[in-house]
């Protein structure tokens, strides 16, 4: 039995279907999923099927082909190309045999990069990220994390 109120965006069943929970509902229509939740599921299935764990994900392109319903989804991942320096994966999310999402991921071999002197900035590096203030999209300061209201998907 699927717990639709689990503290997760999706719950997988024994048949490999992903059942969205109430946390995955989008803001426009209660029958449809949020794009962020859908993107998270795509990233999850790509990571789980990863044939090249030594490579790093460097790009993820997601196409929402139609509205994604608040209903069980199936996922399929295919290896498009793999080698020692790169790997290309494709993912497809389906509902009732209709493709609702197509995605492609690129993984590359991590390598040390030396930045030449002429390409380095003349100004100092920014402060430690932990000391920087956090602002909203309009540039207004946000309260510290422990004083913030939880988002609607994490309430």
PLM regions and their residue ranges:
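Terminal targeting signals and extreme-terminal segments of soluble enzymes
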Residues: 1-155
């Amino acid at each position: 039995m699927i717990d639709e109120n689990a503290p997760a965006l999706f719950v997988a069943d024994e048949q490999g279907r992903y059942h969205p929970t109430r946390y995955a509902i989008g803001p426009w229509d209660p029958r449809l999923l949020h794009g962020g939740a859908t993107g998270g599921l795509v990233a999850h299935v790509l990571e789980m099927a990863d044939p090249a764990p030594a490579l790093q994900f460097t790009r993820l392109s997601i196409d929402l082909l139609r509205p994604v319903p608040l209903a069980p989804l199936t996922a399929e991942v295919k290896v498009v190309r793999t080698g020692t320096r790169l790997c290309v994966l494709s993912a497809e999310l389906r509902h009732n045999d209709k493709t609702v999402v197509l995605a492609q991921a690129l993984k590359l071999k991590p390598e040390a990069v030396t930045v030449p002197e002429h390409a380095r900035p003349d100004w100092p590096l920014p402060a430690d990220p932990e000391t920087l203030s956090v602002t909203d999209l309009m540039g207004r300061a946000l309260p510290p994390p422990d004083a913030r209201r939880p988002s609607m998907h994490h309430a």
